[in-house]
Design a protein with these regions (language model features):
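Gly/Trp-centered helix-boundary motif
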Residues: 1-155, 159, 163-164, 289, ...
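Alpha-helical transmembrane segments of integral membrane proteins
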Residues: 125-341
Length: 341
């Protein structure tokens, strides 16, 4: 692992000095790691089955009922009481801590949906009978992955546009600014809702739509940095020596611009997650049935008699966004040369 430069060591020290941001980063990483392992935590399939001396791995392979002594060739339903008794009597089963997946309905409950928290459903069930904890866990993974991909794609486009405008200036900068002014003046949320209502959205289509309108946040920052550094002596010397524009942009100017850019990334990630949550809450986000924090918020609004729905969804979104804001503040302070440990 390469050692950090003295400048980056000082930045890391300033970041660690901000205890709220430092621990928020660790908590966020733990939450994200748990969400990536959602199938091992909440799943309606066994993690491992030992049946009549053979090993079975339902998480990675589909088995039929005949594989476990059943009469049908259909896919095994591990929620079937008969199959559960069959597996337990002739072997043993390793289950996830929560025996419900993102779309598993708890038919065994005796209470109407949404049902309150219980020993089986830690946070209760939603209006469709799904386990709230499982849907929050899977929904958190989708939200973070969507936010990360939107942040990366929009940042790359924004940095590229800002670099070209700031480096070349003149007509390139003029026409680029006019395009951004027109594009940023459009009602983004309404356009996303309009496009989502015309085309049946999925994860990738929704990501493409939001990237289309979300790439302008970093253009101004990168453009300003390039306009500031383009007249520095070392840039003029590189031009005089015949260094290509590509090498000057990527090797000499972009690192300076990235210092300011990195401080915005946690806030862009926070905004990206908020965008997906808002679209899901309004009903124009992920397809129906997808685990979503926004959809749980909508269910909480429509089922005020079941406060556990709204409270669980609200706390999940609030904690996730608060962690990112605290991380962003710590990163901003760490890259501020005026601050000292």
């Amino acid at each position: 692992m390469p050692r950090l430069s003295p400048v980056n060591q000082a930045r890391w020290a300033r970041f660690r000095h901000n205890r709220r941001g430092y621990w928020s980063l660790w908590i966020f990483l733990v939450v994200f790691s748990l969400s990536l392992c959602a199938e091992l935590i909440a799943n309606d399939k066994p993690l491992l089955v030992r049946y009549e001396g053979q090993w079975y791995f339902p998480l990675v392979k589909n088995y039929s009922e005949r594989d476990f002594g059943g009469p049908l060739a259909t896919t095994a339903d591990y929620q079937d009481p008969w199959l559960q008794r069959q597996l337990e009597n002739r072997g043993w089963v390793l289950w996830a801590p929560v025996r419900f997946g993102a779309n598993t309905i708890n038919f065994a409950t005796t209470q109407p949906f949404p049902s309150p928290p219980s020993a089986k459903n830690w946070l209760g069930t939603d209006a469709n009978g799904g386990d709230v904890f499982a849907r929050i866990l899977y929904g958190t993974r989708i939200s973070i992955l969507f936010g990360l991909m939107l942040t990366i794609c929009s940042s790359v486009m924004g940095v590229l546009a800002g670099a070209l405008q700031g480096y070349y200036g003149g007509k390139v900068d003029l026409w680029g600014q006019r395009l951004i002014e027109v594009w940023s003046g459009m009602p983004t949320l309404f356009l996303i809702i309009l496009l989502s209502s015309v085309v049946q959205p999925n994860f990738w289509w929704l990501l493409a739509i939001t990237v289309l309108f979300g790439w302008m946040s970093l253009v101004g920052v990168v453009r300003a940095e390039f306009l500031r550094t383009r007249n520095f002596d070392y840039i003029r010397a590189a031009l005089a020596l015949g260094v290509s524009d590509r090498d000057i942009i990527l090797r000499h100017m972009l690192p300076n611009a990235m210092v300011a850019t990195l401080t915005f990334l946690p806030f862009i990630l926070c905004s990206s997650i908020t965008t997906l949550t808002s679209l899901d809450f309004l009903g124009f986000g992920l397809p129906l049935g997808s685990p979503s924090l926004g959809e749980l918020l909508l269910q909480g609004k429509n089922n005020l008699q079941a406060p556990w729905l709204g409270i669980a969804a609200f706390l999940s979104v609030a904690i996730l966004l608060s962690l990112l804001i605290f991380i962003g503040e710590a990163v901003r302070d760490a890259f501020d040369p005026a601050r000292a440990v």
